[in-house]
């Protein structure tokens, strides 16, 4: 009985650790129209290099809008973008640092939003 309880406890602990996915964004700020900003997203709790990663945003009073995506190494790290940001925004990643980036150039007032990275 003691062995069985220990085994169940171990499984619960491992499942808890596995579910602790964290994505922490940084780098926002106030800039004038035409300016630039670079956002970062630090990932943990999963094998970052295996996953496609997306940026989405939510403008004040509006719903979520997809910004763009970078695929994983197996898919050549290819990227795609929403029409509204294509040519101005660039998504990159550094698998060695478990980090995702969003370089935003030629910013417009309509780019004002809360930006989120997503797996």
Curated annotation (Swiss-Prot):
Q: Where in the cell is it found?
A: Secreted; Cell membrane
**Which BP terms in the Gene Ontology apply to this protein?**
immunoglobulin mediated immune response
Instruction: Identify the stretch(es) annotated as Framework-3.
Output: 80-117
Coiled coil location? none
A Pfam family for this UniProt protein? V-set
Specify where the region named Framework-1 lies, as residue ranges.
Answer: 20-44
Q: Which residues form the Ig-like domain?
A: 20-119
Extract the ranges annotated as region (Complementarity-determining-1).
45-52
UniProt keywords, alphabetically: Adaptive immunity, Cell membrane, Disulfide bond, Immunity, Immunoglobulin, Immunoglobulin domain, Membrane, Secreted, Signal
Q: Which cysteines are joined by disulfide bonds?
A: 41-117
| Signal peptide positions (record) | 1-19
Provide the Gene Ontology terms for cellular component.
extracellular region; immunoglobulin complex; plasma membrane
Please tell me where this protein is predominantly located. secreted
Annotated region (Complementarity-determining-3), positions in chain: 118-119
**A molecular-function term among this protein's GO annotations:** antigen binding
> What are the boundaries of the region Complementarity-determining-2?
70-79
**Residue span of region Framework-2:** 53-69
The keyword Signal belongs to this UniProt entry's keyword annotation: yes
Q: What does this protein do?
A: V region of the variable domain of immunoglobulin heavy chains that participates in the antigen recognition. Immunoglobulins, also known as antibodies, are membrane-bound or secreted glycoproteins produced by B lymphocytes. In the recognition phase of humoral immunity, the membrane-bound immunoglobulins serve as receptors which, upon binding of a specific antigen, trigger the clonal expansion and differentiation of B lymphocytes into immunoglobulins-secreting plasma cells.
Indicate the quaternary assembly. Immunoglobulins are composed of two identical heavy chains and two identical light chains; disulfide-linked.
* Protein name (Swiss-Prot/TrEMBL): Immunoglobulin heavy variable 3-72
User: Which species expresses this protein natively?
Assistant: Homo sapiens (Human)
């Amino acid at each position: 009985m003691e062995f069985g309880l220990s085994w169940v406890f171990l499984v619960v602990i491992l499942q808890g650790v596995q579910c602790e996915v964290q994505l922490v964004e940084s780098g926002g700020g106030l800039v004038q129209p035409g300016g630039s900003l670079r956002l970062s997203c630090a990932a943990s709790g999963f094998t970052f290099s295996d996953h496609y990663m997306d940026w989405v945003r939510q403008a004040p009073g509006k719903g979520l809008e997809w910004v763009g995506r970078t695929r994983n190494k197996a898919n050549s790290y290819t990227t795609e973008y929403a029409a509204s940001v294509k040519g101005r925004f660039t998504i990159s990643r550094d698998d060695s640092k478990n980090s995702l980036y969003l370089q935003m150039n030629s910013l417009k007032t309509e780019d004002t939003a809360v930006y989120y990275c997503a797996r």
